[in-house]
Amino acid sequence: MRVLGLMSGTSADGIDAVLVDFTGDPSRPKWQILNTFSYEYPSSIREKIIQVGQGLKISSKDWLELAEEITELNAFAARTCDPDSTAEVVGCHGQTLFHRSVKKSKRGGSLQILLGPLLANLLDQIVIYDFRSKDIASGGHGAPLVALVDEALVGRLYGWRGVLNLGGIANLTIIPPKTGIDKTSQCLGWDCGPANSLVDLAVKESTNSSLTFDENGSLASLGIPKLEIIDKWLRDPFFYLEPPRSTGREQFGFQYLQKRKKELGDISKEDLISTLTTFTASIISQDLDNLFKLKQIRLIELLVAGGGSKNLFLMRQLQKQCCGVHVRPIHEIGVPSQYREALVFATLSWWNFLGKKVHPKYITGANKPILYGVRVDP
């Protein structure tokens, strides 16, 4: 079955589209990517998305027009990736504007902006969208949803395997081995903390918007990370919350960056970017250490996806800090890093079409099996 997946992440840099053909057992399918397309948001839209997500007040008219524009851009990406409309289903995540983590006395919340019925009619195809609401209504965090699909897409090894996504936010999937006493264990997943969100903001600020991200980690590699400050940052109570755990740009965004910059004082932009990038690697390393302390789980391999996998300095830091773990980009096993999340939502859309529910208890914390997404016919 052909499915088109559309994804725009917390980095808000654009839309990734993937056309994929699924066959076989939905729990461990064979899949083949037929085409991909990436659309970069105009800077005006990206800025508005980030600003609205961090509290900018806009009128109802502006809300509607932003939703329409994002929907129309997703339609453009879909048509470009699948010009003959061969997909039986289109799965579209929409653009996250706000995420609220679950608190003891308050349910979580997550807002993705997309007009699903409009997209279905623009494309004249079945659309699956609004993937997080059912999870949140069932007591879950609504994130990280990629962890629900990773085992089906990448499979198991003879030891514990991890999949790390480095988008705006970093999240981890922990996949049990296929043999031995742990083979009946559950897949685990959680949001770790900031990945590219802080670095991208800092790069833009420190270069007067001439750069929007640290390509290949070139700025970070020229600086010296402030390790004693990083050790202090790692004591943030968020990093000690046991999974399920979720977060977003609301927690690790502009205000958080300003606070951390004040603590760092007057340092060069290279040292700032190096410190923030090393901080991300240290968060992952600390999470893996805590995983062993709490559950005696030690990874043999960590597959890295997302924009951060192209950051050579960050990849070196991960290998350095995650001792004994083979760290490598996910594209080495045939999963294209840039399109992994679009592939995930294509898979969830396929499962929705088939009526396949998933129990996310050990990933999002939801209390029952869920059919992810809402179907809209044209």
Swiss-Prot record:
EC number(s) recorded for this UniProt protein: 2.7.1.170
Assigned keywords, A-Z: ATP-binding, Carbohydrate metabolism, Kinase, Nucleotide-binding, Transferase
Annotated residues for binding of ATP: G9, T10, S11, A12, D13, G14, I15, D16
InterPro entries: Anhydro_N_Ac-Mur_kinase, ATPase_NBD
Catalytic reaction equation(s): 1,6-anhydro-N-acetyl-beta-muramate + ATP + H2O = N-acetyl-D-muramate 6-phosphate + ADP + H(+)
Any GO BP annotation: amino sugar metabolic process
GO MF annotation terms: ATP binding; kinase activity; phosphotransferase activity, alcohol group as acceptor
Pathway assigned to this chain's UniProt record: Amino-sugar metabolism; 1,6-anhydro-N-acetylmuramate degradation; Cell wall biogenesis; peptidoglycan recycling
Keyword Cytoplasm: no
Membrane spanning stretches: none
Keyword Kinase assigned: yes
UniProt enzyme class: transferase
Family the UniProt entry places it in: Belongs to the anhydro-N-acetylmuramic acid kinase family.
The protein's role, per its UniProt record: Catalyzes the specific phosphorylation of 1,6-anhydro-N-acetylmuramic acid (anhMurNAc) with the simultaneous cleavage of the 1,6-anhydro ring, generating MurNAc-6-P. Is required for the utilization of anhMurNAc either imported from the medium or derived from its own cell wall murein, and thus plays a role in cell wall recycling.
PANTHER family reported for this sequence: ANHYDRO-N-ACETYLMURAMIC ACID KINASE
Name this polypeptide is given: Anhydro-N-acetylmuramic acid kinase
Gene symbol of the encoding locus: anmK
